Amino acid sequence: MPSSSSGNSRHFSRVAPVVLAILDGWGHREEVEHNSIRSAETPIMDALWHAYPHTLIEASGAAVGLPDNQMGNSEVGHLTIGAGRVIRQELVRISETVQAGRLGQTPALIALAERLRKSDGTLHLLGLCSDGGVHSHINHLCGLLHWAAAAGLNKVAVHLITDGRDTPIQSASKYLHQIEDAINASGVGELASLCGRYWAMDRDHRWERTIRAYEVLTDPNQSISRVTAEDVLSASYANGTTDEFLEPTRLSNNYFKDGDGLVMFNFRPDRARQLVQALTLPDFDGFPRANQPSLDVVTFTQYEHDLPVGVAFPAESLDDLLGQVVSEHGLRQYRTAETEKYPHVTYFMNGGIEQPLAGEERHLVPSPRVATYDLAPAMAADTLTESCVNAIESGVYSLVVINYANPDMVGHTGVMGAAQEAISTVDRCIGRLLDSTGRMGGTLLITADHGNAELMQGSDGQAWTAHTTNPVPVILVEGEKRKLAGYGNDIQLREGGGLADIAPTLLQLLDLPKPDAMSGLSLIQAIDSPTPSARLPQPV
C-alpha cells in the first residue's frame, strides 16, 4: 500500500476503489405488469439511471457464448464478466458433441463403458431433466441413451431430477415423454426414479435435503411406487407440489449397487456437487450413509478438483482474466457475496480457479436458512452491505466486487410481493454503497448478470420462475478521485454492448491495460463520439 511519512508520524494513503455491484437477476423490461422491478420502490436506482451515464447490455444467447435465445445464468454471466470475452459455454460444447454423435469418442465415457461391459454392472444416468439449459439439457440425456446402446450397454437406469425453476413449474410431463421416446428409440433404458431439484440439487449444505435424494438412489429398502411416473406427477400437482419440490420417488428396483456406473450429466457444478460428494467421497461427513455403493462415476464437467470421478468434458483453461490483471499489477481486490452467489464472484468470475489470486480477499456472508427465499426476501443483503462498506472504507482495495442475490433467488420463487421487497432491499443497499464509495472518492459501476425478477408471470398465467433473455442495466457513477483523464464530465456509455465489455470497462476505470485476449470493449466513450460498430466478441 503506498505511504508517505512526515516527522515521527506515518500516513498511509487510502485507495479510492472501483466498486462493481452485480444485481443478480435484475433485468430490464419496459412493461410494468408482472415486473417486480418496475413496480417496486426503487428511488436510488431510478435517480442514478436518470442522473448518470447508463446503458443496456446483452446478457443472454450469443453475447455470453450460449445458443441464440438461450437465457443467461449466473455462472455464465460471472464467467463472461471476469473473462472480458465471449467464452464458448459448456452447453454449446456438449451439445455440439452430442449432435455430431461424438460422445463415444470421449475418453472418460469410453473407459466407463469398457469397465461396465466387463463387470456387467448397470449404467445409471442422473441429472436435471429439462431444456432449461442452465444446469443441463435433455438432449444430452437422449444422446447418452444412444451412446449407451451403441456401446453395448443394455442395463441402463435413468434417474430424472425434475426442474420447475428454469422451466415452467408444471412442465415435467413434457420432458418425461421425451425421455420415454428416447428410451424406445435407443432400445435401452428404464425409468428408475424421480426427484425434485429442491432435494437433489441443494448447494447450501442443507444436507437434510440431499440425503432424501441420496436414499432414493441407494437404499435397497426404499418402497417402489405402484403407479407410473406420469401418475406420480399428477398426484404431486393435485397436492400443490410443483416440479421443483417433487418428492423423491423410486419407480423400479434399479438403485445404485456395487460395481455399477454413473454418469451425472449436469454440466454446471454448483448444484451437482453435494450429491456427487455423498456418492463418491470416502470421508464424507454431511450425513450418515447407511448404504455406500462402490460406483464408477463420470461427471460431465469438473465439479471440484478432489472428487474421485472421471470428467467427460474437462474445462478449457483461461488466462488474462480481470482478477489476474488486477493481481499482476500489485493491486488488492475484495470479493463478497452471500452463500447463494459466493462461488460466482470467486470461482466462476476467476474462470474456474478455486484458490484466491495474490492480493484477492474473499468474504462469505451466510444466507438465511429458510425453505424458500420468499420467506426472507431481504436475505443477507444488509449484513453483506455492511461488510462491503467496511472493505471500501478500509482504503486498501482497488477493486471491490459485490453480488446481491435477492432479485434472482426471490425471483425464482415466483412470489410477486416478496420479489418487490427483495428489489427495494437491494435499492436501499445500493444507496449505502453509493455513499461509502463517494466518501472515498471512488467509482461505482452497477450491472447485472442476467434477467429474472422483471418477469414474474408467464403468458399462461402461471408463476414465471426462470431467467429471461432481457438486457441488463449498466450505470456508471464516477468518483472525484477516479475521474478519467481527457473526458471531463462528458462521458456516456455506448449502446450495443454485452457482459464481455464489463471487464474492459473496469480496467479503464482502474487505469490498467486491457490484455489482447480480452476481445470485449470498454463501454465508456465521450459524448457525441461515434459508437463502435456493434459487434459481439467471437467465442474462444
Swiss-Prot record:
The enzyme's E.C. designation: 5.4.2.12
MF-aspect GO terms: manganese ion binding; phosphoglycerate mutase activity
Annotated positions binding Mn(2+) 1: 408, 412, 467
Pfam families: iPGM_N, Metalloenzyme
Cited InterPro entries: Alkaline_phosphatase_core_sf, BPG-indep_PGM_N, Metalloenzyme, PGAM_B_sf, Pgm_bpd_ind
Active site: 74
Protein residues bound to Mn(2+) 2: 24, 74, 449-450
Alphabetical keyword list: Glycolysis, Isomerase, Manganese, Metal-binding
Swiss-Prot/TrEMBL cofactor(s): Mn(2+)
Function: Catalyzes the interconversion of 2-phosphoglycerate and 3-phosphoglycerate.
Family per record: Belongs to the BPG-independent phosphoglycerate mutase family.
PANTHER family per the UniProt record, alphabetical: 2,3-BISPHOSPHOGLYCERATE-INDEPENDENT PHOSPHOGLYCERATE MUTASE
Protein name: 2,3-bisphosphoglycerate-independent phosphoglycerate mutase
Species per Swiss-Prot/TrEMBL record: Prochlorococcus marinus (strain MIT 9313)
Organism phylogeny: Bacteria, Bacillati, Cyanobacteriota, Cyanophyceae, Synechococcales
